[in-house]
Swiss-Prot record:
Name of this protein: Seeligeriolysin
Coiled-coil regions listed in the entry: none
Region of interest: Disordered: 36-55
Family, similarity comment: Belongs to the cholesterol-dependent cytolysin family.
Compartments where located: Secreted; Host cell membrane
Amino acid sequence: MKIFGLVIMSLLFVSLPITQQPEARDVPAYDRSEVTISPAETPESPPATPKTPVEKKHAEEINKYIWGLNYDKNSILVYQGEAVTNVPPKKGYKDGSEYIVVEKKKKGINQNNADISVINAISSLTYPGALVKANRELVENQPNVLPVKRDSLTLSVDLPGMTKKDNKIFVKNPTKSNVNNAVNTLVERWNDKYSKAYPNINAKIDYSDEMAYSESQLIAKFGTAFKAVNNSLNVNFEAISDGKVQEEVISFKQIYYNINVNEPTSPSKFFGGSVTKEQLDALGVNAENPPAYISSVAYGRQVYVKLSSSSHSNKVKTAFEAAMSGKSVKGDVELTNIIKNSSFKAVIYGGSAKEEVEIIDGNLGELRDILKKGSTYDRENPGVPISYTTNFLKDNDLAVVKNNSEYIETTSKSYTDGKINIDHSGGYVAQFNISWDEVSYDENGNEIKVHKKWGENYKSKLAHFTSSIYLPGNARNINIYARECTGLFWEWWRTVIDDRNLPLVKNRNVSIWGTTLYPRHSNNVDNPIQ
């Protein structure tokens, strides 16, 4: 994972956990009987209300039940993507003045994600302290929240300057609405008391990228939230597979702050006194669906960017990296042209704009200006939930989603048509023999070579003779031979040039001159084709 100090852009999200108020200092309303501020440093777990004998019995049974669940935390949250059995063969095709060779290789990706991305469609299910089942629904980013009575919990925020007293809040009844009110209270407390001392809080940037080849591969990389994201990004997997475009997907998490939940000292601490083991069993809490809780939520902005180029160059990724980082490519014509002729599409979640999701298209030259917007947190630039972390309730261990997928990596290379320019100005009769191989591929990807010859081979040419031989992009192993007639009985023909297995170039200039006894030649290249 790369950490870039990039600044992302204006993001949107309607269901904000931090409500923007008409006046800057208005604090969101909440039920003070449910959300209270701890008067002193809060202990590791919030103080529990004394339990009745029945409630103690329920707690003991819940602890015994959850502690007794037998599951493998390393295999319970797994996304298994596509399995590749057949790799399509190598192929080539003519495209205008180029011959394109497309090659495919089997690849695999294995990604462990502790943070699960949030997008608007599921944000209502996500809040700090939520009790969820660690199962397929969580892997699919559709957490199944347990509808049970909850005990109190303590939230904390990591905004700078806040004391241990101010950065925590005690939530008596942690329903979603009460938790969101508590989050608003914590953040507004910082806005009121600490924002002047810390006027420019730069967001923490979490950056990752992946050249795109299949949806399954990108889901394994970025999580199952990418399914919904791609409805807007529209990665062109068909064109990528055909070798017609190269696309890269980049994910930015611009994190303003994290809301954390204190770890419970035992599983029962997260349940109200009336909740029983039988209720949990009836709700499907078992070894296949063990309980977990959202231990941390990151608030900020999430940006997904698709970079797209029709270039067949192997420098496309380098060009994309330069465009994103602002690195100068002055002097590198190839990188400059790739950047100039590439485009991007950005899907942005969060921020102060009115729309839920903002979608922006443009060329790469405009992208960095967009990314520079909204680099710091303030009241007018609020964050939204962009990712969350879950822990198993049994032992507070981190619940890591393991994403695996195989995919076909497609690479393409273009070979531009070229030509050989012949110039004969020598004082003699000359003959040429020019030949080459033209390459193609059969249905199994095996290379087929067809030998080709110039139609004027071994025809006598007098000075001054010029001609151009046009070669297709799939021409290989070019041979150029010329001889001159000396008039000498013992050496009637003398070799002037004999160059073999030459590469295809845009312009190859072959000249012969001189006399019968002293023939000369040159073989020069203009604009070599890489």
